[in-house]
């Protein structure tokens, strides 16, 4: 992948930064994207009179994060038209309508979109469709930072991660903790952890962990892990129901968030698992404990539960669907999964009144030293066979120590 300050800045501030650059990267991006956006605009009103229809088609059909007209709002109509004119290119007629305003407008009535008549009209969705990406444009965040935000909606707290790949750091945990605290304080119905991104969360930001090693600040790392664990316990022990709505990848620390919620409402396109062993680490946000509890609940056999947890965590097993997640004890019978992600936020909000808080659990009965030695022997044999690396063995020994 090409890395540059320009591309890093574009990811943070939007595509307009890239397109306004007159270097080779910017010129290439402009040449390609301007053609696509002009073509999209030329389809109105022949294909549809509503720009939102084209944006939806590109997002749902081609997995775009933003549609053409949402991108044009980010780029700026005036800049886009001026540059087309400067290059002697044809400006689609629809772009010349109501030049002073964006295609999308957030009002007290809800999100509106510009029509070919030059007048805004409400975006209408079926009753079951609720998108946070649209909803939040009409709401004010109760608390927000660069990586996460939370909103109050329908007497509920809705938490959104919005960092790159929704990687978690201290800022993410601050918002999550504040949402749970404020929801209890205000007497809200509960907390929903959700976002409209491609992935729920790809785990803890390894860059922030790496930084601790590079500057030899191990206390900072300890403080972060303590903050992570305490936030997970705060969610689990809250008097209010906490529901997670995973889509795409929920792995590593992102899956630890899911594990500590009272109910999981997953998309059929969900990938879950504790994958830290794949990068030579151990899950440190409480995930090991939760997986061990889940296997005990599922099997009622402490030795087999410990062995299954050892294999799950040590091998970094992934569930590539909710059905696989159930087999790996990643989800409970009370959890559910749904095909249409546009319905999931509404389902989660409705479920808050029906969710049963996970009761206080008895301490786990651990299997002890003999079982630990059996796991160490398994690791040694597989190291000799060349199936594990020496560091795999090191990680595996620590996982075995935890689950026994």
Label every model-predicted segment.
Residues 1-191, 195-198, 207-227, 233-239, ...:
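N-terminal glycine-rich phosphate-binding loop for ADP-containing cofactors
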Residues 256:
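Short alpha-helical segment that forms part of, or immediately flanks, the ligand-binding pocket
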